[in-house]
Amino acid sequence: MNEPTIAQPVLFADLIDRPVIATFDQPHASSDGGAVLLKAADRHVGVVAALTATVPDARAPTRVTHGVGDLIAQRVFAIACGHPDGNDGDRLADDPIHKLLLGRDPIDGGRLASQPTISRFEHTAAPRMLLAMSHALADTVIARHRRRRRRGVRLITIDLDGTEDQTHGAQQLTFFNGFYDHWCYLPLVGTLTFDDEARQYLVAAILRPGNAAGTAGAVSLLKRLLPKLWRAFPGVRLRVRLDGGFATPEMFAHLEAAGVEYVVAMAGNAVLARHAEPTVAPLRAIVATTHDTATTYAEAAYQAGSWAAPRRTIIKAEVVWHPGRAPRDNPRFVITNLRQTPAWIYTHVYCARGDSENRLKELKHALAFGRTSCTRFWANQLRITLTAAAFVLWQELQLRADRTALRGAQVPRLRQALITIGVQVVRSVRRIVLHFPQAHPDAATWARLARALGAVPA
């Protein structure tokens, strides 16, 4: 077994009034001490077990050191803790907390899987397995919120958002995308909003080639999600909210055949501009007088050439004023089958989808959603799925934090306060004790969350 390399001690001779020596020599210690909260969260959600149940393992059991469940758990917890790279497996192989997360003895338990083992596992990914994992992820999230919302749900809003994942190597199906001006993948992310809650919950994440159409995979994803939601929440109204990249005849036909509400942005064109002109024209005169942006709302019956019939179109008529610039028309269009007023539909329904982009930011910047550096496309889809599972655990912690000082905090702040905590692990015959710093600034909040996840006073 390779011994870990210990950093050489360093000396700050004159940093303060006496020498300061720093050395990495504390055995049985970890910098991810708070990660036991993630394991406790998974006990309530069950996402690791759900994913594990979908993955076959054809290896001879007598020759297996790291089972599929251990590999999935190791990767999900590592990603959640801020260690998204497969190489992190080598650095964390003897970390006592990461051993504990897999149910191993934190002191004497076997080392965790190495980077080559993780890489081999990732490259076993195949379409059938990944589809089963996608179903398991969605089923787990939906079941969790069915238990949470025991009093029932009237409305579930489904947001689908495409995003770009810049690539830098020779991965399969990465292509140059002229819109983004670089080589990339184009993942598709699905979230759910229950009634008028402020938070969107991740329910699906699909990797798409870099040259995929904006709607690629969207209809098939809805075909999977809608029946699951109706089974879990009988009688619920389903509303699909999309940006302009999804406004295709196929999408509208599917939404209407499925009998769901929809609010879909539509890119402007000459015909829509003519519909908007009677509403925009008076605003120009207002802006010329007030020197301030003016906005109003209207509607029209618009029929694209590829549509069999006209659809209700909400018009946001706006003339934008900037000092030192000429006023600029800024009309926006939304296609919908809702019956409320144009202003209400645009401001209260469509604009609310903007917050779903914050979920993309959390995925990208806090959980390295774009760490798709495997050679094979399906291996990268597996990484996307495991990252989504890690985010599901974080969203469970966000729910529990809503009654604490960390209400509304995103993943980076929560990880700083709750997970990245130095800890010394002490094991006896009867128990394992985690010794955290007495001066940790969020100790009270940590303890409150631990109790919310099932811990009791010791």
Annotate each language-model stretch with its function:
Residues 161, 236-247:
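Acidic/histidine-rich, metal-coordinating catalytic segments
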Residues 90-91, 105-107, 238-239, 401-411:
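Short, glycine/acidic-rich hinge or "gate" loops at secondary-structure transitions
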Residues 41, 89, 346-382, 386-397:
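Short amphipathic alpha-helical "interface-anchor" segments enriched in bulky aromatics
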Residues 1-213, 219-232, 258, 398, ...:
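Dynamic "connector" segments at or just before major functional cores
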Residues 28, 61-70, 325, 374-384:
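Structural motif
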Residues 252-261:
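Short, surface-exposed basic-aromatic patches at helix termini and helix-loop junctions that form
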Residues 4-23, 261-365, 452-458:
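An anionic, glycine-rich sequence signature occurring as long contiguous blocks
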